[in-house]
Amino acid sequence: MSKLKIDTKRRFSLLIALVLIISLSSCATTQTNVTTKTVFNQETTYHNLLKLKKWQANGVIGIIYDNQAESANYTYLQDGDNFSIKLYGPLGIGSIEIKGDTNSVSLANSKGQKLTAKDAKTLMLEQLGWYVPVEGLKYWIKAIAIPNIRQTSELNTNNLLSKLSQNGWSISYSNYQLVDSKYPLPTKIRMSRDNLTLKIVIKSWQI
């Protein structure tokens, strides 16, 4: 009788594991390289990307400022107006997390210290000496311009952004992947303004 109970428990555990595997597989984000032969409809692509409000991007960021160079791994989550950017690795200050919305931003480090401010730029400049333009990043990381703000841009042979100038930033894009068979998203971004340059490599997208 006890053996029957063990077998039943094992079967139940296997069933649960199988259900979890199927669920995770169905939610997995697919990514394929965009070939030079693929040409996208610019208007359709823009509206699809504009409607994309929630994602996670993982990769590496390089920062060049005031004749200094740093790098870090990152995880960037966006959900509507809410965002979270986790930086960790060779940054030299341990791990940090910047999170917030349109009203306030907080920065927490691995020592448990937490600071708040009205905007990310002020907080990051005070603590890091450089900043990520989070207000624009939620558009620029998808390779689209901020709506209703003046900009100049150039397209590549795929009809996707290769260069964008907006809000004082010069942004260039190289390498795209088609995510979930619908969204052409960049994997390499270079952003510069004044004496600050950000080199963003996106290793994976989850949407």
From Swiss-Prot:
One of its GO terms (cellular component) is cell outer membrane. Residues 1-26 form the signal peptide. Belongs to the LolB family. Coiled coil: none annotated. A lipid is attached at C27 (N-palmitoyl cysteine). A lipid is attached at C27 (S-diacylglycerol cysteine). Gene3D superfamilies: Lipoprotein localisation LolA/LolB/LppX. Keywords: Cell outer membrane, Chaperone, Lipoprotein, Membrane, Palmitate, Protein transport, Signal, Transport. One of its GO terms (biological process) is protein transport. Monomer. It is a lipid-anchor. InterPro entries: LolA/LolB/LppX, OM_lipoprot_LolB. Plays a critical role in the incorporation of lipoproteins in the outer membrane after they are released by the LolA protein. It holds the Pfam family LolB. It comes from Francisella tularensis subsp. tularensis (strain WY96-3418). This is Outer-membrane lipoprotein LolB. It comes from the Bacteria.
